[in-house]
Amino acid sequence: MAPRVSRLHLALCLLFIALIFSGCNTGYRKVDGKWSYVTWDEGHGYRTNPLGADDSAFTVLGNGEYAKDKNCVYYRGRPIAGAEAGSFVLLKGGSYPYAKDKNHVYLTDVTVVNADPN
């Protein structure tokens, strides 16, 4: 006869799984008082990428993939080359992460060639 799994054991297993996955989120957060982009993977665990961002002007945008301070725009913790932070905004609608500044349109951290930001 096969052993029965009690409801308590099942509940404890589900709770354990939920706790494991709830701690695996990535994104922008303060680590030791400085803004960083934190990722997690099974082989290494947490990886922290300090940004060197201006704390007083740092803002996480939209769904948390983009962020900016007064000098730089970031996508998943990497600076977007040539992006102008003062005019940088996310574009609404669609299922892709488009954004623009006064000079360019971006898809993730890539400049969309010949796209008009106006």
Residue ranges and their predicted role:
Residues 1-12:
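Bacterial N-terminal signal peptides that target proteins for export
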Residues 11-20:
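Bacterial N-terminal signal peptides
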Residues 24-118:
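Non-catalytic tandem-repeat scaffold regions and their flanking low-complexity/translocation tails
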